[in-house]
């Protein structure tokens, strides 16, 4: 009687979609109110003046103006602010 061993099933073959994180508007760019500035996991960048933080830590503009990135504070954190024009 001819026999052939059954082929095993692979445990690979899955992958998640990329989340498109990162800086969407860079320093010096002029943006409108409500525009997303940074998409991130956690608070790599912190909200400064005229910027708010969503529940998934996305930073967005609350007024129109120019984007400004600056390091300040005791922990040398990076803050994102909007300078009104």
UniProtKB/Swiss-Prot annotation:
Q: Name one GO molecular function term.
A: structural constituent of ribosome
Under Pfam families, the record lists: Ribosomal_L27
Q: Name one GO biological process term.
A: translation
* Keywords of the record: Ribonucleoprotein, Ribosomal protein
Which interval of the chain is the signal sequence? none
One GO cellular component, as annotated: cytosolic large ribosomal subunit
Task: Say if the entry is tagged with keyword Nucleotide-binding.
Answer: no
Q: Does the keyword Endoplasmic reticulum apply?
A: no
Chain segments carrying region Disordered: 1-25
Q: Which family is annotated?
A: Belongs to the bacterial ribosomal protein bL27 family.
What name is this protein filed under? Answer: Large ribosomal subunit protein bL27
């Amino acid at each position: 009687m001819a026999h052939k061993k059954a082929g095993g099933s692979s445990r690979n073959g899955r992958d998640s979609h990329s989340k498109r994180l990162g800086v969407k508007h860079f320093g010096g760019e002029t943006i409108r109110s409500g525009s997303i500035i940074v998409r991130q996991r956690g608070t790599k960048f912190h909200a400064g003046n005229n910027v708010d933080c969503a529940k998934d830590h996305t930073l967005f503009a609350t007024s129109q103006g120019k984007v400004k990135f600056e390091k300040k504070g005791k922990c040398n954190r990076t803050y994102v602010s909007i300078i009104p024009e």
